[in-house]
């Protein structure tokens, strides 16, 4: 198995401030919610910082080791303390609820933006990007980011406010002792920077392997039948084990670094508390003895409060370290999500075209010119890889209402021609004209809304048979839906279903046979009533009898419409106005069925070969 989109994992291990500023911008979209969280966290942090001050007051007033204790004001003290606890509890409940609400809002905003982006990307993106990769971005990465952003904001606000008040109180109590205690912060910053960079490196590798695992699961599920028929279970299991083992190793390394980081913070916090106890204790003894140290006068209440601040100060530092560690860990996810959001479609309309014709989300149908269906390739060059050109100086004219069939070996360029007509890709040089106008001067939606494309491998969407038939025309009435099904002889099998047109097809149409899915796909296109039909080996999944019925039915449908047919069974294109034999991206034979048979070339040989095969199969029956 091969995996795409992995270049993004190989980036420098450093925090990207612009990236996180952009992500945290999703939280700022709901400013009212953010302000509520801000106010709640400010109140909680202030109350947390007030507790050591109350402790200092209680010791110096009610205990007083240097004088006679007093109980004056103790009930007021209890009342104030209780009031602070109640207010803090209320605000804590509020910010927890609001943070959960923000998490959901961020998740919704990112997923909505990502889904809309996927609707606008060209086929080249999907050719290069696995479904497993996209699912991992849309589900696990977005969930990880929304959770981290929402709760990181909450934690960051509390840590910031609390540390600010702690620093202020410590410098207010004794600025010299405060400087001694805070001396451990610079080495903590250096250690944090080093470990965080290492964490990001291993987390990036782990997420890369996680994406591979998701792709492997997706391929394993989608290709289960092929795996079993080729007896690939053991080999697939070994390949999967290799991927999971690589992820396990990278995850363990990242976990070890994270586990090492927090004890370091705790140890440095203990050093700070010890410094407060040693120097502050000496100051208290000197004060009680009637002398002073270089720290000045320090009361017992001040020392206890200082120790409380010193020990609790490293809790927010530890939490901040955790936030930055999580950000380092999640940065790989953030990069991938934003990379998806920033992906530009290779095929896109100009701003001037969008202004006139609109976009897929805001079409301006009143400005759309009617399409007759005349198609011209004017000296077109095209390649997927520059080193492997597929079309060179390719010229072709398809008249409006003409049925043109494309025949050739696999890889000859038939599907490429179709993809260019549909503007799934654009020429590297040259022009493609629709009704005499370069189709790049008009919108993709203008063209594709007049296209009916039936693929060799049909895709149905979750829902009922009726929903799928009118997928391209949701406002179609019941009579139109049934008429479209009858035209392609799909109504026979539909009526045999227990729920008829209300039958659920399952994800991808899994509850129907390939032939049944193809019939529904035909009905869907006919109901959409396009001016240009594209049939890409569309009858290869249907039995011969049904195929003949469909051919007779769609002959009437295709009347006065342009149709391009990519055919494997040559018997299905005998009535085409023109048949083009494509080889190595060039037209080597051209004419109707009878003309090409008389020519005695590639088409003649291929047709006779298929005729003999069909005759043999009929004889075997």
Region locations from a protein language model:
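Hydrophobic alpha-helical transmembrane segments of ABC transporter permease domains
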Residues: 39, 47-51, 91, 103, ...
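An intracellular "coupling" helix at the cytosolic face of ABC transporter transmembrane type-1 domains
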Residues: 24, 31-32, 123-124, 140-149, ...
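Transmembrane helix-loop-helix hairpins at lipid-water interfaces of multipass membrane proteins
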Residues: 34-91, 171-176, 285-300
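Juxtamembrane helix-loop junctions of ABC transporter transmembrane domains
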Residues: 8, 12-16, 39-43, 47-60, ...
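Membrane-integrated ABC transporters
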Residues: 1-48, 63-80, 95-99, 103, ...
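Helix-loop junctions and hydrophobic alpha-helical segments within the transmembrane domains
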Residues: 114, 118, 227, 337, ...
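ABC-type nucleotide-binding domain
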Residues: 357-621
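Helix-loop-helix
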Residues: 66, 169-183, 253-335, 340-341
């Amino acid at each position: 198995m091969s995996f795409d989109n992995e270049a993004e994992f190989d980036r420098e291990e450093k925090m990207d401030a612009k990236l996180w500023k952009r992500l945290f911008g999703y939280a700022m979209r709901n400013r009212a919610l953010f302000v509520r969280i801000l106010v709640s966290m400010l109140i909680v942090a202030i109350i947390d910082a007030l507790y050591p001050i109350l402790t200092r007051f209680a010791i110096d007033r009610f205990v007083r080791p240097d004088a006679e204790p007093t109980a004056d004001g103790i009930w007021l003290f209890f009342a104030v303390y209780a009031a602070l606890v109640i207010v803090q509890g209320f605000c804590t409940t509020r910010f927890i609820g609001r943070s959960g609400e923000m998490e959901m809002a961020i998740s919704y905003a990112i997923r909505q933006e990502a889904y809309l982006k996927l609707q606008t990307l060209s086929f080249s993106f999907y050719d290069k990007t696995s479904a497993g990769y996209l699912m991992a971005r849309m589900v696990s990465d977005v969930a990880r980011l929304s959770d981290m952003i929402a709760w990181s904001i909450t934690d960051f606000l509390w840590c910031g406010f609390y540390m600010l008040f702690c620093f202020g109180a410590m410098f207010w109590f004794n600025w010299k002792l405060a400087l001694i205690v805070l001396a451990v912060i610079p080495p903590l910053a250096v250690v944090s920077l080093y470990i965080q960079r290492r964490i990001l490196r291993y987390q990036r590798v782990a997420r890369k392997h996680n994406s591979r695992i998701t792709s492997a699961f997706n391929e394993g599920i989608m290709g289960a039948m092929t795996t079993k028929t080729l007896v690939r279970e053991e080999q697939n299991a070994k390949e999967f084990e290799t991927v999971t083992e690589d992820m396990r190793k990278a995850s363990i390394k990242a976990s070890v670094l994270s586990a090492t980081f927090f004890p370091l913070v705790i140890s440095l916090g203990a050093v700070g508390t010890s410094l407060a106890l040693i120097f502050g204790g000496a100051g208290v003894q000197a004060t009680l003895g009637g002398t002073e140290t270089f720290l000045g006068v320090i009361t017992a209440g001040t020392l206890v409060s200082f120790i409380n601040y010193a020990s609790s100060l490293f809790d927010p530092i530890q939490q901040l370290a955790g936030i930055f560690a999580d950000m380092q860990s999640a940065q790989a996810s953030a990069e991938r999500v934003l990379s998806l959001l920033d992906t530009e479609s290779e095929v896109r309309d100009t701003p001037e075209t969008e202004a006139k014709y609109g976009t897929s989300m805001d079409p301006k149908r009143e400005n759309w010119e009617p399409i007759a269906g005349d198609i011209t390739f004017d000296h077109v060059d095209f390649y997927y890889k520059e080193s492997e050109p597929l079309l060179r100086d390719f010229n072709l004219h398809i008249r409006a209402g003409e049925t043109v069939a494309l025949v050739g070996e696999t890889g000859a360029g038939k599907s490429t021609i179709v993809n260019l007509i549909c503007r799934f890709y654009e020429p590297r040089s040259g022009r493609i004209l629709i009704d005499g106008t370069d189709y790049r001067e008009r919108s993709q939606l203008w063209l594709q809304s007049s296209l009916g494309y039936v693929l060799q491998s049909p895709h149905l969407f979750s829902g009922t048979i009726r929903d799928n038939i009118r997928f391209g025309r949701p406002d179609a009435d019941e009579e139109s839906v049934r008429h479209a099904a009858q035209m392609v002889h799909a109504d026979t099998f539909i009526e045999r279903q227990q729920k008829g047109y209300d039958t659920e097809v399952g994800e991808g149409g899994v509850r129907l046979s390939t032939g049944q899915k193809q019939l529904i796909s035909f009905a869907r296109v006919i109901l959409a009533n396009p001016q240009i039909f594209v049939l890409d080996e569309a009858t290869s999944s249907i039995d011969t009898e049904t195929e003949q019925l469909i051919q007779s039915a769609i002959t009437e449908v295709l009347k006065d419409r342009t149709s391009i047919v990519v055919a494997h069974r040559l018997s299905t294109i005998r009535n085409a106005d023109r048949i083009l034999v494509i080889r190595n991206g060039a037209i080597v034979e051209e004419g109707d069925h009878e003309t090409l048979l008389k020519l005695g070339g590639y088409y003649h040989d291929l047709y006779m070969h298929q005729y003999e095969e069909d005759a043999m199969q009929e004889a075997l029956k």
